[in-house]
């Protein structure tokens, strides 16, 4: 079988990070305008993964409500993949119920737009909660992708070469304490290993020789993952031409503008039976210089205290009596509102 290069277009989108929310919001509108234009103009631009969130569409349509019909069309056609989360979260800085409601809200909102991407997506979480496989399986999701927490993580987030791999491959089984098990995919070459693919032949040859070798080093099957994007990365508008160039240069490789659903399906059909089993929390601190969780738990304690108080009020004070005789929509807005904060 020929090796298949699955190129998945995406952009990792923090609503707030090095800029305040509204500045990122303006950038997101520009980003989405360009993405939708590309998808309308180029039928060979097969799909785009919207970072495992649905809130990006809410933010975009707040400014561009006239684009709602087009957005829903692309979601239903499985060209624009959204969810299953409402918003990407740091799993350790919120209560456990928040993680459940984030997934519940995201799947409900994605279904409202027309389709749910059933891949547990944790691209840049600073470690992952041990019960994630159990929670995902309960939601009908049996595959997850993540970038951190499996040891050892090398410099620039690449897996280090030594004999102490927790997982020999970028694919593994991830198991919760209750025994729930899903297929896990580690971004061993990070989630930007397929960004800015050159369309010019000479540059493309050098690019793909390096990228293919990097992916083959860790892949357990002939299906190689290339993430075409990075943090707040604009869509690559000439990707279709770039993949045509790659196909001409490397006839022994099948280049596919893919999506996580197809990629995970291929993995499940062909993965090795002796994959490593990673159990519980993914919180490895073993690195060659970068600590995956440093300085995240103790920053801005007052905000964490306020968030914890809100969650406690929802779960222990407001919802129990509401469940007895409350109007359904009264508290439905609470968790999405808290998630935005």
Where are these regions (language model features)?
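Catalytic-domain carbohydrate-binding cleft regions of carbohydrate-active enzymes
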Residues: 1-341
């Amino acid at each position: 079988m020929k090796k298949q290069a699955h190129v998945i277009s995406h952009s990792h989108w923090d609503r707030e990070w090095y800029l305040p929310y509204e500045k990122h919001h303006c950038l997101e509108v520009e980003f989405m305008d360009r993405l939708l234009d590309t998808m309308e103009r180029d039928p060979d631009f097969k799909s785009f993964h919207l970072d495992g969130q649905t809130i990006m569409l809410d933010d975009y349509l707040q400014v561009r409500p006239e684009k709602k019909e087009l957005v829903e069309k692309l979601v239903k056609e499985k060209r624009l993949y959204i969810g299953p989360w409402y918003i990407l979260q740091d799993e350790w800085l919120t209560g456990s119920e928040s993680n459940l409601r984030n997934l519940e809200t995201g799947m409900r909102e994605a279904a409202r737009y027309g389709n749910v991407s059933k891949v547990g997506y944790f691209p840049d979480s600073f470690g992952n909660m041990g019960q994630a496989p159990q929670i995902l399986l309960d939601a009908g999701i049996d595959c997850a992708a993540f970038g951190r927490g499996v040891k050892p993580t090398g410099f620039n987030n690449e897996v280090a070469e030594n004999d102490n791999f927790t997982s020999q491959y970028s694919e593994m089984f991830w198991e919760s304490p209750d025994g729930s098990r899903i297929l896990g995919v580690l971004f061993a070459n990070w989630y930007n290993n397929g960004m800015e693919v050159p369309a010019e032949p000479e540059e493309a040859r050098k690019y793909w020789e390096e990228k293919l070798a990097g992916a083959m080093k860790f892949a357990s099957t002939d299906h190689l993952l290339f993430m075409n994007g990075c943090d707040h990365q604009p869509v690559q508008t000439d990707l279709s031409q770039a993949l045509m160039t790659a196909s001409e240069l490397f006839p022994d490789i099948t280049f596919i503008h893919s999506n996580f659903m197809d990629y995970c399906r291929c993995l499940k059909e062909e993965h090795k039976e002796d994959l490593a089993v990673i159990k519980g929390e993914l919180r490895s601190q073993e690195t060659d210089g970068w600590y995956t969780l440093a300085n995240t738990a103790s920053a801005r304690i007052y905000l964490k205290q306020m968030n914890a108080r809100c969650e406690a009020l929802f779960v222990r004070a407001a919802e129990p009596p509401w469940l007895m005789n409350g109007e359904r929509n009264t508290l439905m807005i609470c968790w999405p509102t808290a998630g935005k904060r």
